[in-house]
């Protein structure tokens, strides 16, 4: 196992490949009982872990880890491996090899995301269903050149081993990858190809061929690009896999003599043709069909004559049509790119798409049966025409060939009739044949392209084929797949055990050869041998009358009862009938033979095949070339005319031929096996289903391999290693002191151990063990080591104790000796003789001094002579030393020169390394940039789709709003007509009725014109939407640009603002039209109401205005009060903040004092901890209370601002209405007089037309002045119209120029797309070049290491010389110090003992001082806590003041409710006035009824018009009750109050719940709170009373509002009843109106003519104004676009210049942009959610649209104010949240500080003062009392916070309702402008990117050249260094010899 340092080369992939050292050590040390730890069989989980409880009578009782107890048989219990085998990398090395051990090892590794595991020769991989970082370039580099045992299991390891074996053994290799669908075979195949394309890269492009469009990339690119193309045509969605390969493939990658890629080819097997015409519900057909219909390339849709809806084509829509994990548009581009890279010509590319489209059309061919015949005939020719056109055929010939095919009978051809079903079968067979042959042809073309004609020597084959399949319904396809796996398993068994047994033979082990490959022979022979299943199937296909039944009977006759592998299936309920069963190695499979004969023959319509051969599509003709006579393959089949008269090759024969070729290829290679496992059916990462995995392990041969392995000796070890490791088991078996061979030692050792001696064998170099024995030896070794270590520890401890005891004895003897001598001296010190001795002894020495002097003189003379000799010798040595120093200096100069040269070489090498690192960074940057661009491109594509969806939804919203507006206008117009008609009927003005009818028609025309204008606006939006879609499609290919993504958010904001501006312009134009219409309406409103009604309304409105002004004043006063309260709250918050800082400072002082004291008692620690927590909690409560108060104040302030704004708007509306009514009053007076005279004239001369004309002339004279004004206006408008037409032409010309510019940009975009493709290819080349450069740098680094080693050797030689020079000096110093230290050693020991005693005394004194300091510190703490209690009392008083302020706010809220109640009463009075007016109108209607009783005979003629008037009267009644609006507003307010009431109720309930929780806390700590409990209970009771009082107040308010609402409902019901009564009266009145209308018709003819002229003039004026506005809008739009384009051009130019100056800044921006992309994605998701919410709100608001339309502008202003207030509130809220978060962090820090101080307080537990403890307890009790008060205040503050949050949500909803719809429409319009600007930006960026790429390429080539030069210089330096090294060694040798 590798160390963590060795695993570091794998980077971030290391944890996913191998366990860390820590985990391995933990596993080895884990407790484990080998006798009781087992796996046990269990029905649900297959196997579970457990512990053996007992064994008796062949039964075992096991307790599982889940706690269940199972009693099972002995053979259902499997021993568990020791913990050191947990997550083992090679399962063949496990002690106990069985199914549960394999299963749990895979499961535990999978849980740790180690998905690769070895199992002997296998590599097992489990699909992780998530991305793991184990395939990057770092991992590829780490595995390169590593042996299998040196690196963790990985597909790269398998690949590298195959590659290395190929190079070293000169043998072809193969990698067999098998597994079920969805297990990851295709992905692992891609990784193998990726590995070879990386390590064996050529880096050279193939030579260009003359055919255009070929050779778009290197060989590596083409090998990699072959995969997307094959996946498009051969992969499909299945139930278990979204990208399942429906064919097998064998990819051969050929290498040259140097190991570089030379070429490649692909062989395919068993393409699932049936999927072309049939799919299950949860599956779909091949990807290519849906890619084409994704509309990513619209030219394909046009070329193939198809639609984009898959459901239009039967062959591809039988299952699902979309796959969430696959982007068909992007996949189409990848497929198309792969076709180009692989060198297909343009004609071949078109042919591929055409044939694919023809297959789709084939599924839509319809046929019917002729009458009275079974003959089929075409049912329409349209589809046949399309299919024939795509295939280059004549449609008539095609249909004729299908319905009347020609068959050969003898030597003649006859025409045969076909039934409808036969024709459909033929069509399906043709479609499958065309698709199959086209797929095989593409594979052939790919192989031709990958064949580079370069010299190639060996290949590595990768086999990706489906694994063993056992389904409920198994057909011929499953038999072929299972037979293939049977052959592969036989091949594996043979290969695996042949290798094993060859090793046994080589090692000389006695072994009886077993051919495990023959284990499967019976099943294989049953299928493929003569008279086998395939043989009988082909024989049956020869007979024309053969059926499935005859085939089954032959099978039974031939094999049932004769072959053990062939059985009759057992009938199973609920499953499809099976006809026979085969026993495969992986299990028994039931096969159903229905349709096998047809599948095997695969017949084709010969006549249609003949047409295909003559097709004008060359590819189709080539596909069927060589198909002669009856079948497309008659001439080419190998068995034609030879096997039982067969003239065709069957599917089974072709399959066996391909399989034999495959097995031949595999037998010629050295195989490597990879088994892919699917862990679960739900694609859940990390989950493993036991039964599913075991089934696959059986099917793919893993357990079969284990079975074979167990029969042999899977564990083996070298003799020397075995002796070294297991010698401890019996050391006496190997004699000491004499040589013994390792083999003999191993034999003796094993013979002396109590084990089964049949479980191992001795080879020549290794000892071989059966499975499990090595684990037993390991356990025995562990036990022996434990015993030895225990014994060693005991002996070591004994020896150390004895040494210490000896030292103690020696010290005691020395002390006794010293004491004895000192006592003896003290005894004789005063003895007289001793004193005399002390005096005489110095005198005795003087006599001897003269002798000593004489001797010294002699010695001096001798010394003098010796000194002279020494001086002479010294001078001689000095001369020698000078010479040596000279030589030394010379050598040092040489060494210095060498060092300098070496330093230069190292410096150059470092520069090269730095250059290489920079290049790698640049290459990595470009690679990451490309990957980011691809990801961004995908994200932007998704965003584009979302924007398109939003656009369509917004368009629908616009339509709905326009319809609503039209409806409102129509209803308004109808209401006005009703009022007009009622007035005329009451006055009896028949002439006026006809006149108003004419005006009504004119207004309808105007209304229609308005609708036309709205339609024109809608068309504009549609045009812009189409332009946006087109531009987005053009920009998709360039969306990878990083700079555009950086600005995307800003562009979207600009787009939104621009669209808002455009929509506002459109709304203003609409409003202008409405104003024009309203001007006409004002003429009609002159006759709408009587004078008395107008007077009463004016008076009512004036009274209401006075009331509203009064309310405004009151609200303003209220706002001032609230502002004062807010200021007070802020002041209290500032005080609380100050107190918090004081408490923090005090806490720091506490910490310092506690550090000085060194600790306190455990009780004090606990109290201090609680006290600090309480302080923090009180601080937090105060801050939360402040936050809540301010939030409440902000909410109230916003509410009052909204109320003031609303009331102000109502006053403005009322004043406008008042002015309007006064104007109407004066005009109506004049017109009433005129109408009165007209009425008299009409009543006197009903039949006299001349009198009526004169009356009209009188009326016209009164209108003469108005007509003259209109005429003058018409003249002005005519001139203006001409001028506008001129401007319109100019604007149209400018618009055309802009369109031309857009088309030019589109063409430029296509060119840039091609340039980007080229840049991508260049990027890939740079990546490959980077790999080569990395190899070169690696070799340079190696050379540098050699130079560094040489330099170190020179340094060592130099140091050796220095050591030799200093050695003599050191020896002299050692001798000198030795005698000095011996003399003073004993004195130092005494001094040391004295110092120790002094030190102990000093320590004791310091301890006493520390205790005194602790006492003083505790006294200080006591004083400080008293001060804190006083501060907290002040805080409580402030909190009480805040509560009082809240109570004041509550009283103000009650006052507001009372004001609203008064407003409701006033509204009720207005309603009663309206009812009074209704009653007066009813009386007048009765009068009209009596006056027109004679008109009953004309009822029928006016019935339809009267019905319309009936509806209009009902609307009029609703409009008369204008108080209804205010009632509706009061209802809204009531609902709000109810909601607030419910919120307050919820808050109160929460407060009660919190109170109960706090009471529970009080009960738990009641022992500590006895002193303050009564006070807390009293305060809680007071707060409860306040809450109850607040509840009662709100209940009373709600009850009063409910009663008012009931009264309002009753009044509305009365109004409805009155309305119904009026409708009945109106029906009677309508009968009377008919007669008067007919009489007045003639009189109004001239008036109509005049009115018509006026209306035409008005229409022309409106048209001119609209044209002018449209042109102005277009001009403004074009100018804005131009300005935006110019501004972005300048901005991008500056940005790119800055990028050139600083590349590092660009890299940082890359990271920032990636983060912003994620942010934009998050914001986009948020906007989508908001949009959905708004759609729901819009549907709720539509019912109130009438009121909203009339007050739209006022509502917009109100919304702006609301947004401003909401923003302010959000800022304040965020500010307070930040403050709260900061305080929370401080709290946590302080709590941590207290915890740290707690440990220091433990030491002083016994020294704490009892008095101090009592005082602290009292203070803590007081603190808790204050805490209770603060918490009670907190409860009320929580209620306020909840109210604030709900109001914030309401503000946001109102803001979105008024703003978001308009913003969404404007955003889309501006997006179009942004995309147009981006086209130019992309163009410039592409050009600059190309230039930058060229610069980088030139730099790279320059650096590569420099690198080569550096390598040459390094070689020269190396040779020089070698020379210097030799020379230096010679000098060194010379110096040593001279010394």
From Swiss-Prot:
Residues 659-681, 761-775 are annotated as: Actin-binding. Residues 33-82 form the Myosin N-terminal SH3-like domain. Residues 1128-1147 have a biased composition (Basic and acidic residues). GO terms for molecular function: actin filament binding; ATP binding; calmodulin binding; microfilament motor activity. SMART domains: IQ (SM00015), MYSc (SM00242). Keywords: Actin-binding, ATP-binding, Calmodulin-binding, Coiled coil, Cytoplasm, Hearing, Methylation, Motor protein, Muscle protein, Myosin, Nucleotide-binding, Phosphoprotein, Thick filament. One of its GO terms (biological process) is muscle contraction. The modification Phosphotyrosine is found at residues 389, 424, 1464, 1492. The modification N6,N6,N6-trimethyllysine is found at residue 130. Its main location: cytoplasm. It holds the Pfam family Myosin_N. The modification Phosphoserine is found at residues 1092, 1096, 1162, 1237, 1243, 1261, 1288, 1292, 1303, 1306, 1474, 1495, 1514, 1542, 1554, 1574, 1600, 1603, 1714, 1726, 1739. The modification Phosphothreonine is found at residues 64, 69, 419, 1241, 1255, 1265, 1286, 1467, 1501, 1517, 1730, 1736. Gene3D superfamilies: 1.10.10.820, 1.20.5.340, 1.20.5.370, 1.20.5.4820, 1.20.58.530, 6.10.250.2420, Kinesin motor domain (3.40.850.10), Myosin S1 fragment, N-terminal (2.30.30.360). It comes from the Eukaryota. ATP binds at residues 179-186. The modification Pros-methylhistidine is found at residue 757. Residues 843-1939 form a coiled coil. PROSITE patterns: IQ (PS50096), MYOSIN_MOTOR (PS51456), SH3_LIKE (PS51844). Required for normal hearing. It plays a role in cochlear amplification of auditory stimuli, likely through the positive regulation of prestin (SLC26A5) activity and outer hair cell (OHC) electromotility. Belongs to the TRAFAC class myosin-kinesin ATPase superfamily. Myosin family. Muscle myosin is a hexameric protein that consists of 2 heavy chain subunits (MHC), 2 alkali light chain subunits (MLC) and 2 regulatory light chain subunits (MLC-2). Interacts with SLC26A5. The rodlike tail sequence is highly repetitive, showing cycles of a 28-residue repeat pattern composed of 4 heptapeptides, characteristic for alpha-helical coiled coils. This is Myosin-1. It comes from Sus scrofa. The lineage of its organism: Eukaryota, Metazoa, Chordata, Craniata, Vertebrata.
């Amino acid at each position: 196992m590798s160390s963590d340092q060795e695993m570091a080369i794998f980077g971030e992939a290391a944890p996913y490949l191998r366990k860390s050292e820590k985990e391995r050590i933990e596993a080895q040390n884990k407790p484990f009982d080998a006798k009781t730890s087992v796996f046990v069989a269990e029905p649900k989980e297959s196997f579970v872990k457990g512990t053996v409880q007992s064994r008796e009578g062949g039964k075992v009782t096991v307790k599982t880890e889940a706690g269940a107890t199972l009693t099972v048989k002995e053979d259902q219990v499997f021993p568990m491996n020791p913990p050191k085998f947990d997550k083992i990398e090679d399962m063949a090395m496990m002690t106990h090899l069985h199914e549960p051990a394999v299963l749990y090892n895979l499961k535990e590794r999978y849980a740790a995301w180690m998905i690769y595991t070895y199992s002997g020769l296998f590599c097992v991989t489990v699909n992780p269903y998530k991305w793991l970082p184990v395939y990057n370039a770092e991992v590829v580099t780490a595995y390169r050149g590593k042996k299998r045992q040196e690196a963790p299991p990985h597909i790269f390891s398998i690949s590298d081993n195959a590659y290395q074996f190929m190079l070293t053994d000169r043998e072809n290799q193969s990698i067999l990858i098998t597994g079920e669908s969805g297990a990851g075979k295709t992905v692992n195949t891609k990784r193998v190809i990726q590995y070879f394309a990386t390590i064996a890269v050529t880096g050279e492009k193939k030579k260009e061929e003359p055919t255009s469009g070929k050779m778009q990339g290197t060989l590596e690119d083409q090998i990699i690009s072959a995969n997307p193309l094959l996946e498009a045509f051969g992969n499909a969605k299945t139930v278990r896999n979204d990208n399942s390969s429906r064919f097998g493939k064998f990819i051969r990658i050929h290498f040259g003599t140097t190991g570089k890629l030379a070429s490649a080819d692909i062989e395919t097997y068993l393409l699932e043709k049936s999927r072309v015409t049939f799919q299950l519900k949860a599956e779909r057909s091949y990807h290519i069909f849906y890619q084409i219909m994704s509309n990513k390339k619209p030219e394909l849709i046009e070329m193939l004559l198809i639609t984009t809806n898959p459901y239009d084509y039967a062959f591809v829509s039988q299952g699902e049509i979309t796959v969430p994990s696959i982007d068909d548009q992007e996949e189409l581009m990848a497929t198309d790119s792969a076709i180009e890279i692989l060198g297909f010509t343009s004609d071949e590319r078109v042919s591929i798409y055409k044939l694919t489209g023809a297959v789709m059309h084939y599924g839509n061919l319809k046929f019917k049966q002729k009458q009275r015949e079974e003959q089929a005939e075409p049912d329409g020719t349209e589809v046949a025409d399309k299919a024939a056109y795509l295939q280059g055929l004549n449609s008539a010939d095609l249909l004729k060939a299908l319905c009347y095919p020609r068959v050969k009978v003898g030597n003649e051809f006859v025409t045969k009739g076909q039934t409808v079903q036969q024709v459909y079968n033929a069509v399906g067979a043709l479609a499958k044949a065309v698709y199959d042959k086209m797929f095989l042809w593409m594979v052939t073309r790919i192989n031709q392209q990958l064949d580079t004609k370069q010299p190639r020597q060996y290949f590595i084959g990768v086999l990706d084929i489906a694994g063993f399949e056992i389904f409920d319904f198994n057909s011929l396809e499953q038999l072929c797949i299972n037979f293939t796996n049977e052959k592969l398993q036989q091949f594996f068994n043979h290969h695996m055990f042949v290798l094993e047994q060859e090793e046994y033979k080589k090692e000389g082990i006695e072994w009886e050869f077993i051919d495990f490959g023959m284990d499967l022979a019976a099943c294989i022979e049953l299928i493929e041998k003569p008279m086998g299943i395939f043989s009988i199937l082909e024989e049956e296909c020869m007979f024309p009358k053969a059926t499935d039944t005859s085939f089954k009977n032959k099978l039974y006759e031939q094999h049932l009862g004769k072959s053990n592998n062939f059985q009759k299936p057992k009938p199973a309920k609920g499953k499809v009938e099976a006809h026979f069963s085969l026993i495969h190695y992986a299990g028994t499979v039931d096969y159903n033979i229905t349709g096998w004969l047809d599948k095997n023959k695969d017949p084709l319509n010969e006549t249609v095949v003949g047409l295909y051969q003559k097709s004008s599509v060359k590819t189709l003709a080539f596909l069927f070339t060589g198909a002669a006579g009856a079948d497309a393959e008659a001439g080419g089949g190998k068995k034609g005319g030879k096997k039982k008269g067969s003239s065709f090759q069957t599917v089974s024969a072709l399959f066996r031929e391909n399989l034999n070729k495959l097995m031949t290829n595999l037998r010629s290679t050295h195989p490597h096996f990879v088994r892919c496992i699917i862990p679960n059916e739900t694609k859940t990462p990390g989950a493993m289903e036991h039964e599913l995995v075991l089934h696959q392990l059986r099917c793919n041969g893993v357990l079969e391999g284990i079975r074979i392995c167990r029969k042999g000796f899977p564990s083996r070890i070298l003799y020397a290693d075995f002796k070294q490791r297991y010698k401890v088991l019996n050391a006496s078996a190997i004699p000491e002191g004499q040589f013994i061979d390792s083999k003999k030692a191993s034999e003796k050792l094993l013979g002396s151990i109590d084990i089964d001696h049949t479980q191992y064998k001795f080879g020549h170099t290794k000892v071989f063990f059966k499975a499990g024995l090595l684990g037993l030896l390991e356990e025995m070794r562990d036990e022996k080591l434990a015993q030895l270590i225990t014994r060693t520890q005991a002996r070591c401890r004994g020896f150390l104790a004895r040494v210490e005891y000896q030292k103690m004895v020696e010290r005691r003897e020395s002390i006794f000796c010293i004491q004895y001598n000192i006592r003896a001296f003290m005894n004789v010190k005063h003895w007289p003789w001793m004193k005399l001795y002390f005096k005489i002894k110095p005198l005795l020495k003087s006599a001897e001094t003269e002798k000593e002097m004489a001797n010294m003189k002699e010695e001096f003379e001798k010394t003098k002579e010796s000194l002279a000799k020494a001086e002479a010798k010294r001078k001689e040595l000095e001369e020698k030393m000078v010479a040596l120093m000279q030589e030394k200096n010379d050598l040092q100069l040489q060494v210095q020169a060498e060092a300098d040269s070496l330093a230069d070489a190292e410096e150059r090498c470092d520069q090269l390394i730095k250059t290489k690192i920079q290049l790698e960074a640049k290459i990595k940057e470009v690679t990451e940039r490309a990957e980011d661009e691809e990801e961004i491109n995908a994200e932007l594509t998704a965003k584009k789709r979302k924007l398109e969806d939003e656009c369509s939804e917004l368009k629908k919203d616009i339509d709905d709003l326009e319809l609503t507006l039209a409806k409102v206008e129509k209803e308004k117009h109808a209401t006005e007509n009703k009022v007009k008609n009622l007035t005329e009927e009451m006055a009896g003005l028949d002439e006026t009725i006809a006149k108003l009818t004419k005006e009504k028609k004119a207004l309808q025309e105007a209304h229609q014109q308005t609708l036309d204008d709205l339609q024109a606006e809608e068309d504009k939006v549609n045009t812009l939407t189409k332009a946006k879609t087109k531009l987005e499609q053009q920009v998709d290919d360039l969306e990878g640009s990083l700079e555009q993504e950086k600005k995307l958010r800003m562009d979207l904001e600009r787009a939104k603002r621009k669209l808002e501006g455009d929509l506002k312009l459109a709304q203003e134009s609409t409003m202008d039209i409405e104003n024009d219409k309203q001007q006409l309406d004002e003429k009609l409103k002159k006759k709408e109401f009587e004078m008395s009604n107008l007077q009463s309304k004016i008076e009512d409105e004036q009274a209401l205005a006075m009331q509203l002004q009064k309310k405004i004043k009151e609200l303003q006063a209220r706002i001032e009060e609230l502002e004062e309260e807010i200021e007070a709250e802020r002041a209290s918050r500032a005080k609380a903040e100050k107190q918090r800082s004081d408490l923090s400072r005090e806490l720091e002082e506490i910490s310092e004092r506690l550090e000085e004291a060194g600790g306190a008692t455990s009780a004090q620690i606990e109290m201090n901890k609680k006290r600090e927590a309480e302080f923090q909690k009180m601080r937090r409560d105060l801050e939360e209370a402040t936050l809540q108060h301010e939030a409440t104040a902000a909410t109230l302030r916003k509410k009052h601002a909204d109320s003031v704004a609303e009331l102000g708007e109502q006053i403005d509306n009322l004043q406008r209405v008042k002015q309007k009514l006064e104007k109407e009053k004066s005009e109506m007076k004049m017109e009433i007089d005129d109408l009165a005279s007209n009425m008299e004239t009409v009543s006197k001369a009903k039949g006299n037309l001349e009198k009526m004309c004169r009356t009209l002339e009188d009326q016209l004279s009164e209108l003469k002045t108005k007509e003259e004004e209109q005429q003058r206006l018409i003249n002005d408008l005519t001139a203006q119209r001409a001028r506008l037409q001129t401007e319109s032409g100019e604007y149209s010309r400018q618009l055309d120029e802009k369109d031309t510019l857009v088309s030019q940009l589109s063409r430029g975009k296509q060119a840039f797309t091609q340039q980007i493709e080229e840049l991508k290819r260049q990027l890939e080349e740079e990546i490959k070049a980077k790999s080569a450069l990395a190899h070169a740098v690696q070799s340079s680094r190696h050379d540098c290491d050699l130079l560094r080693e040489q330099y170190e050797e020179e340094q060592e030689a130099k140091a050796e010389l220095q050591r030799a020079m200093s050695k003599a000096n050191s020896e002299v110093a050692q001798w000198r110090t030795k005698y000095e230290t011996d003399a003073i050693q004993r004195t130092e020991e005494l001094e040391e003992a004295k110092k120790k005693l002094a030190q102990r005394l000093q320590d004791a004194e310091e301890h006493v001082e520390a205790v005194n300091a602790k006492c003083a510190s505790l006294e200080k703490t006591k004083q400080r806590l008293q001060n804190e209690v006083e501060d907290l009392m002040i805080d409580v008083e402030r909190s009480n003041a805040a509560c009082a302020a809240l109570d004041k706010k509550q009283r103000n809220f009650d006052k507001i409710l009372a004001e609203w109640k008064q407003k409701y009463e006033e509204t009720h009075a207005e309603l009663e006035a309206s009812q009074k007016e209704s009653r007066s109108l009813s009386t007048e209607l009765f009068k009209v009824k009596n006056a027109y009783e004679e008109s009953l005979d004309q009822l029928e003629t006016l019935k339809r018009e009267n019905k319309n008037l009936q509806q209009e009267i009902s609307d009029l009644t609703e409009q008369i009750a204008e108080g209804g609006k205010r009632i509706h507003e009061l209802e809204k307010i009531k609902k709000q109050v109810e909601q607030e009431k419910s919120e307050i109720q919820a808050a109160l309930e929460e407060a009660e719940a919190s109170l109960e929780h706090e009471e529970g806390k009080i009960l738990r700590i009641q022992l500590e709170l006895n002193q303050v409990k009564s006070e807390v209970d009293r305060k809680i009771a007071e707060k409860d009373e306040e809450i109850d009082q607040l509840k009662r107040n709100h209940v009373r308010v709600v009850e009063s509002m409910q009663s008012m609402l009931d009264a309002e409902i009753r009044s509305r019901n009365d109004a409805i009843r009155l309305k119904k009564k009026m409708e009945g009266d109106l029906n009677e009145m309508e009968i009377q109106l008919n007669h008067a209308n007919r009489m007045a018709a003639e009189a109004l003819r001239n008036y109509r003519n005049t009115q018509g002229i006026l209306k035409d003039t008005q229409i022309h004026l409106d048209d001119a104004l609209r044209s002018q506005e449209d042109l102005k809008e277009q001009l403004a739009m074009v100018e804005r676009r131009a300005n935006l384009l110019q501004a972005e051009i300048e901005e991008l130019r500056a940005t790119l210049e800055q990028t050139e100056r600083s590349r590092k800044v660009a890299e940082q921006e890359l990271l920032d942009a990636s983060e912003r992309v994620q942010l934009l994605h998050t914001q986009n998701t948020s906007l989508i959610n908001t949009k959905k919410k708004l759609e729901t709100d819009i549907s709720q608001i539509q019912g109130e649209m009438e009121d909203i339309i009339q007050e739209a502008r006022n509502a917009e202003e109100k919304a702006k104010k609301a947004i401003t207030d909401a923003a302010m509130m959000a800022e304040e809220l965020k500010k307070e949240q930040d403050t709260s978060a900061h305080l929370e962090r401080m709290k946590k820090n302080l709590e941590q500080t207290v915890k740290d101080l707690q440990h220091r307080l433990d030491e002083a537990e016994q020294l704490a003062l009892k008095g101090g403890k009592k005082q602290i307890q009292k203070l803590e009790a007081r603190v808790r009392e204050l805490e209770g008060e603060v918490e009670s205040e907190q409860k009320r503050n929580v209620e306020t916070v909840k109210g604030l949050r709900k109001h914030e949500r309401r503000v946001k909803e109102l803001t979105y309702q008024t703003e978001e719809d308009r913003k969404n429409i404007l955003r889309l319009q501006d997006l179009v402008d942004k995309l147009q600007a981006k086209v130019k930006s992309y163009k410039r960026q592409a050009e600059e990117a190309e230039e930058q790429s060229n610069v980088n390429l030139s730099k790279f080539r320059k650096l590569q050249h420099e690198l080569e030069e550096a390598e040459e210089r390094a070689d020269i330096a190396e040779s020089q260094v070698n020379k210097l090294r030799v020379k230096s060694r010679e000098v060194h040798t010379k110096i040593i010899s001279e010394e």
